[in-house]
C-alpha cells in the first residue's frame, strides 16, 4: 500500500514529457495556411504550407500543440503551429477587443479564442468591437462589428490538442 502511494506521488512530482501522437486524417485546404479536418470541426494552422488539397489523407504527428503534417500524395511536410476546435461561445452579443493576426483570422485579446471571418479587410490591433454570435453549430457564426463596419463570422475557435 505504501509503495503504491509512493509511486503515485513520484508520478505527480515528475510529470513525463508529452508523448508525440500520430493521426491519419483527411483534410482540405481552408484558407491561407489553414486546413480543415473534413470529418470534424477542427482547423489546422500551418506555416508557409503551399499544398492545395481537397479530401487528401495526411499523417499528422503532434507533440503537445505543435507538430507536422505529411501529405500522402506529394509526401511534402508542413509544420503545424496549432490545432483549433470550436470555442463553445453561446448565442449573444459580446464586447471584445480584437487583434488581426492574419487575413480572416482575429484573436480576442485576453482570451485564447480566435474568430474566423469571411473576406474581412479590417486591420485591428486591440480594437474594441461587438461580436454577435447567431449560431453555435459547426464552430459558430454571426458578425463582427468595428466602428460602423461589419464582417461575417464563420467560426469561433480555441487551441486544442488532438
Predicted regions located by residue number:
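Positively charged n-region of N-terminal signal peptides that target proteins for export
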Residues: 1-4
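Hydrophobic helical h-region of N-terminal Sec-dependent signal peptides
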Residues: 6-14
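Sec/Tat signal peptide C-region and signal peptidase I cleavage site
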Residues: 14-20
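Extracytoplasmic/periplasm-facing segments of secreted or lipoprotein envelope proteins
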Residues: 21-38, 86-113
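Envelope-exposed proteins and targeting segments
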Residues: 31-33, 54-56, 65-67, 102-104, ...
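Fold-core signature of tandem repeat domains
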Residues: 35-37, 58-60, 69, 108, ...
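Short nucleic-acid-contacting surface segments enriched for D/E, G, S/T with interspersed K/R
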Residues: 47-61, 117-134
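Mid-chain, structured segments of secreted extracytoplasmic proteins
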Residues: 56-97, 138-162
